[in-house]
């Protein structure tokens, strides 16, 4: 049975198109409201949090490495996430109970590369850019 044809089939076409849209992954994501329910950031691009602990995440096969990450509890809703710390030696600038700014990490909410389950990265530590600390342009504020 093909699609209905004829003069009075417009309503049928419109209704069928409306139903079929839900099969499109991007349409469903945009219209179900899961962006606010499932996303720890609640639809925002960045979020602040407190560092709970430093963790090493093992890279997926065929790579062999321990990727340096931190467990962060978000201030806005108390959710706990794992965030990647980019660049070599940057973990030394982060201590437990520091306030960090966390951003998304590529791929529309999916894990990136060989780091399983890590969807966020650290951008700032104690209100100072992690890149500036790494390049030694700025120092950590004395507490």
From Swiss-Prot:
One GO term under biological process is: translation
Q: Which InterPro entries match?
A: NA-bd_OB-fold (IPR012340), Ribosomal_uS12 (IPR006032), Ribosomal_uS12_euk/arc (IPR005680)
Q: Does the keyword Metal-binding apply?
A: no
A single GO CC term, please? cytosolic ribosome
* Any one GO molecular-function label of the UniProt entry: structural constituent of ribosome
What domain of life does the native source organism fall in? Eukaryota
Renumbered residue ranges of the record's region Disordered: 1-23
Tell me how the protein is altered or processed after translation: Hydroxylation at Pro-62 affects translation termination efficiency.
Q: Which residues carry this modification: 3-hydroxyproline?
A: 62
Q: Which Pfam families match?
A: Ribosom_S12_S23
| Keyword Repeat in record | no
**Its principal location?**
cytoplasm
Q: Which UniProt keywords apply?
A: Cytoplasm, Endoplasmic reticulum, Hydroxylation, Ribonucleoprotein, Ribosomal protein
Q: Where in the cell is it found?
A: Cytoplasm, Cytosol; Cytoplasm; Rough endoplasmic reticulum
Q: Where is the composition biased (Basic residues)?
A: 1-19
Instruction: Note the SUPFAM superfamilies from the entry.
Output: Nucleic acid-binding proteins (SSF50249)
The protein's assembly and partners = Component of the 40S small ribosomal subunit.
Q: Which family does it belong to?
A: Belongs to the universal ribosomal protein uS12 family.
Q: What is this protein called?
A: Small ribosomal subunit protein uS12
Species of the source: Drosophila melanogaster (Fruit fly)
